[in-house]
């Protein structure tokens, strides 16, 4: 069997288990000839075990025969940090206005969730990446 030729890659951020064939997904997939409802059905099945509504990045590969495959990534660190400390958004001026504090334990939970998608060889390196994300949002990391 011949290998399918990938013609396009589409990156989206979609709520887990709650995708709907609406404008955002339709506008992204339509120009490539991919069936929006088919993607939504498969995406919702694959993300059913995740927390409903948490936004997850998905990379869709479109092939020359209009078929597709996709990879679901872990939720963005900023969303996990906001959820962990219960805030709506990060600080507009992260270096002066602090919006909250996060414990090292909560940060390590986020590191363990994000580890498959991070470019880090160890948990301590990943901790530095995630704590940097927290600081850039105006969230203080406990010492």
From Swiss-Prot:
A GO molecular function held by the record: structural constituent of ribosome
CDD domains the record matches: Ribosomal_L11
Disulfide bonds: none
Top-level taxon: Bacteria
Gene Ontology biological-process annotations: translation
Post-translational modification: One or more lysine residues are methylated.
Subunit structure as annotated in this protein's UniProt entry: Part of the ribosomal stalk of the 50S ribosomal subunit. Interacts with L10 and the large rRNA to form the base of the stalk. L10 forms an elongated spine to which L12 dimers bind in a sequential fashion forming a multimeric L10(L12)X complex.
Task performed by this protein: Forms part of the ribosomal stalk which helps the ribosome interact with GTP-bound translation factors.
Name of the molecule in the record: Large ribosomal subunit protein uL11
Organism of origin: Borreliella afzelii (strain PKo) (Borrelia afzelii)
